[in-house]
């Protein structure tokens, strides 16, 4: 029991800064929306539309680079720290290549925006302008993620938290300057949010690099001079590990976007209630997602040390802590769901629907916690392909079709509206949790030599 308590302390010490960093990042998006809304409702809508396209694109790159964390954790645990610098440099090359692709997609996103049904031309122009300003921040964001993944792979999660809050604090005045045109800058309205956020991402990257260069704990990693050339073998391995994670993230984000589109014809009350419940459950999701990042670090580190038993301990402890957290957040959600809904909207119909949907959200919080931590465990074992297959099957083969049938058809019961989609979420997330646990159990039953060989690739 003592080993599990000790492991839980280590996991929480790693996870809490990640939680706070994620809150800071979420708050940046909130600040952009609110400050654009302070200028005009059109600018607020433009930022919201632009963000809905930016997120899937940038999260694809973010997911691709998540492969660095278990690679660095495993090298750190095995005492091969001299190889970390080369992996990080290849991570920067990969981030640069992916940034170019993302920037091309975002530059041409105007075709998607202008094809939206009944969209106001002025709104479309502002959304395109916002994206074309924000896309210049894509390299800065992804370079920052490489540097952050380096730190987190070395079990240093506090720098990412600090840089996240620095970015948030800088974002507010820089937004103000570019939205309203102060200190000699042009008045860009909502487009100014894109300029400001792009600048902040570069500032966060430069601040993180400055920290890494000065950190004594990373002195031995900075032993390579000059800029390493692209190493096709290393980059290929990073892509093999990262692409399934990137696709899984992409399919998860697009799932919720598709459901939002399917709910939209049902009426204002249904859309508002669905959005409130989804926004709150997304906030609760930060906890298990951050714990999953910590579990990846611990599992990768233990496998690097050559201890499959300690890796199992880290995995099991992460699951136990995650289930405890999810139980508490589920109780909190059930107990205060009406009061929470009132914070968003005071329309009685909207509040009633949102409270009902939050009850369904509470049901899946334990499953959601297990599946996301299970994904973190599999990343630690470098078993990322299974994450993609499980996520795709659970969300798009099981969850979305069942939700559609329950919400919009009478094949099983009378159309349930938004609640049907939320039952679909429960089916999808529970299926993902079961499959993640089965895969983890399969991996952990393999001979230690095979597990360690797979982890060292």
Curated annotation (Swiss-Prot):
UniProt protein name: Multidrug resistance protein MdtK
Organism of origin: Shigella dysenteriae serotype 1 (strain Sd197)
PANTHER family (UniProt xref): FMN_FAD EXPORTER YEEO-RELATED, MULTIDRUG RESISTANCE PROTEIN NORM-RELATED
Main location: membrane
Membrane topology (Periplasmic): 32-52, 114-126, 181-191, 264-275, 335-349, 408-417
Protein role: Multidrug efflux pump that functions probably as a Na(+)/drug antiporter.
GO terms for biological process, alphabetical: sodium ion transport; xenobiotic transmembrane transport
Cytoplasmic side: 1-10, 74-92, 148-159, 213-242, 297-313, 371-386, 439-457
Subcellular location: Cell inner membrane
